[in-house]
């Protein structure tokens, strides 16, 4: 392939991605706006019209900010590639550190990633202190915002720099099959991060307290016993320091596996509703969704590293993305190849987005069915309804937008599936007082 042809292909996919995302966003805004004045029937007795309209306005605002975010990302990507930004960074560090190639490559990658983070910072700030604050969700202070970003930068450097150094060394010293060794190291690195996250990384950003004794803990322990699930601990996270949104999740595996509840979730839900939410999360584990996802990610990363192994030896790959290759060079430095690949790859993966979203929604339906079987269907409906309302989730998403992006099924469809379970399991929802 000629470098110019690859440049056109890259720009074409990028423009196609932007146009498609803009079209889907416009559909979402129009659809949500058309349905903002009537609460869907399954929720009419539980969610008020003002709350429904607030969720519609919140959804539209998020979509509009998402458009800005997409354009900022596209501009930064083009600036680093075809407009010569990465080439300039590479040449600058070559001049300053001509005799230290490994440090030079790490600094090239670190500089580019830092610039990307700085470009994303204004949108992130607006999201927290304008959009989320406008709708009453933000509880983060500017000081906490800055602290979070500095901690993320530090953790990223402590984990990322050794990872990148190891990958570069493998690329340079393990022959033509370096990509296989690099993939194996990548898998091992991710396993270590999964082990460290619950007990080392997550506590850097949030406080975790053991779940207090009481009715909630008793119901949860009984549920875990019924489902034959052992956890390394039950914890409450101070999510209210940052947001009014609520959630619950599993993290870690083996002895480090733990169950985490946001304090905002526990403050809002009744005991049986908390049990139903946890039963849903248990469903993901019991149906092996997490294991399947890890295997899928492993296969995908293997294909990605194999593709990188081939592309890194193709001069048109570098030249087509704005990196000059001298007449006596077979390829660019390993660090530049890594960075270019992981910058360009997402542009070509857009067609996989709806497939991944569909797989995730399928898993959500299975987890809901497990929750109905092992807890209480009505409590699950009630809990989900409160979560939709408290998180400002629209009840009327555009079907195509939802199919393309959403990892969870649309609210009416999800509640409808739960209510299709046996009547004795899912009693009718009580009316709103």
Where are the model-predicted features located?
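Alpha-helical transmembrane segments of multi-pass integral membrane proteins
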Residues: 344-349
